[in-house]
Amino acid sequence: MRSSDITFVLLSVVATVRSHATFQELWINSVDQVGSCVRLPPTNSPITDLTSTDLRCNVGGTVGVSGVCSVAAGGNVTVEMHQQPGDRSCANEAIGGAHYGPVILYMSKVSNAATDTGSGSWFKVDQEGYDQTLNANCGKRSFTIPSTLAPGDYLLRAEVIALHVAGSVGGAQLYMSCFQLRVTGSGSKNPTGVLFPGAYSATDPGILINIYQTINNYTIPGPTTVFTG
């Protein structure tokens, strides 16, 4: 076995036994929504089956919660991830164990954010590639609700794809949560997007990748278009 292969195996084993994480909090224009509109997954474990409906909003995520968070088009939204439920300490890594990978945010227009199952079309509103931004920012990732987006109910899907054991098919670990939003404003745009499952393939270059080698260019999974209004 080559030394590079041995290094990959050892690092993969170490990373595998380290931390998982959950997107659990939402901020709107710097105001903490205190978990009022998140479909919180039952555990901090990842989804690895890219053909599962759990890919939409995580395990149990087809069932909504009562709260819906209101935000005006053009407003600022921040999602927040941590390793353990209720632990928001910035002293702890948001997602540990060398869980490097992209952060991707999707939205889906729905008739009722509290009851929709997430089976509709999802469009990208923000993405960032292979780095450790979440850990550097206390688990937070911010984006702007597109100013031209039509008003109504939406699901917001926040996702990290951890690539520490993604060198073989089925190794990528996906962590996602859905938030229930009500967008206000006078916009008229209704972007189309992709379905979950279906948006990702197990052999996509951003899904099947050995991160313990030199990476010159990383291809973020999903559609190339990011709707910013």
Swiss-Prot record:
Keyword annotations from UniProtKB, A to Z? Carbohydrate metabolism, Cellulose degradation, Copper, Disulfide bond, Glycoprotein, Metal-binding, Monooxygenase, Oxidoreductase, Polysaccharide degradation, Secreted, Signal
Cell wall biogenesis/degradation listed as a keyword: no
Family the entry assigns = Belongs to the polysaccharide monooxygenase AA9 family.
Q: Which PANTHER family match?
A: ENDOGLUCANASE II, PUTATIVE (AFU_ORTHOLOGUE AFUA_1G12560)-RELATED
Q: Which residues does UniProt assign to the signal peptide?
A: 1-19
Q: What is this protein called?
A: AA9 family lytic polysaccharide monooxygenase E
Question: Which cysteines share a disulfide bond?
Answer: 57-178
Binding residues for O2, per the UniProt record? 164, 173
The function of this protein is: Lytic polysaccharide monooxygenase (LPMO) that depolymerizes crystalline and amorphous polysaccharides via the oxidation of scissile alpha- or beta-(1-4)-glycosidic bonds, yielding C1 and C4 oxidation products. Catalysis by LPMOs requires the reduction of the active-site copper from Cu(II) to Cu(I) by a reducing agent and H(2)O(2) or O(2) as a cosubstrate.
Tell where it localizes: Secreted
Cofactors: Cu(2+)
**Its EC number(s):** 1.14.99.56
**Applied biotechnology:** Lignocellulose is the most abundant polymeric composite on Earth and is a recalcitrant but promising renewable substrate for industrial biotechnology applications. Together with cellobiose dehydrogenases (CDHs) an enzymatic system capable of oxidative cellulose cleavage is formed, which increases the efficiency of cellulases and put LPMOs at focus of biofuel research.
Q: Where are the transmembrane segments?
A: none
